[in-house]
């Protein structure tokens, strides 16, 4: 699919329209959960006038959440390949790498960041990503808009071989377990969860509310909780467990994406020997809900915080 950008790809998959209300209620939980399958990803070259190629596709079906989540994608950025620099003027996008390292660009300033990490591109700014290594990088992409439609303006710059800043001159988030904060009985659950809000609502200009990092150690769980104005998508970075929404329960594992709609009770439990690790994206149903979240007093999550584990 040479020289197609992410909008064209998303439109081809028929997932660009975001309805005012989701279709969650009529679909069983196990059907709403998305499972990453590399064999189903579509090859693309020169993405946003970038170098080389990649394989990617839509993971979570956005019709299962309320709000302007335009897409939630998963894929692989090939060695020595890039997504060229491009602007978003009515939406915001966040590139994520789950391993390796990549050169992230915001407004033509570039820095090398080791994964797992995420870099948001705020509305009205330009971004790009380049994999300078000899190994493929596991990649994700999330987009939230002011409305239901995606926009992009390509600059024709692959960002290959550019000079690097020693310190990134833009917001970023590392998914580093050493930075997590212990939360006892989170949302009324069992054991001690490890949690951090890595990107606050003030980072974003759209109804995008936050990006969180959550780890449930062996034997831990969260209690049931529903948010009246915020939808969430949970991506399982590692481990296995179960999710319960309402009366439905389903197993989950690494690579799964779980949409949780507004007013939908949800709880998670870890299983097996490996901690259950999540990347969480929160999207407000509208800007009024986003402003209310920003004006609310912390903490944003239930549970009792223990001694800080770092910033």
What is the meaning of each model-derived region?
Residues 90-102, 229-242, 246:
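Glycine- and acidic-residue-biased ligand/ion/polar-headgroup-sensing regions
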Residues 109-124, 247-263:
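Short acidic-glycine-tyrosine-enriched beta hairpin
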Residues 73-88, 212-227:
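Conserved short histidine dyad/triad with adjacent acidic residue
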Residues 67, 123-149, 242, 254, ...:
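Ligand-binding loop in jelly-roll beta-barrel domains
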Residues 1-5:
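Positively charged n-region of N-terminal signal peptides that target proteins for export
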Residues 8-20:
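Bacterial N-terminal signal peptides
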Residues 23-69, 84, 149-208, 223, ...:
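A short, N-terminal "cap"/entry segment at the start of jelly-roll beta-barrel domains
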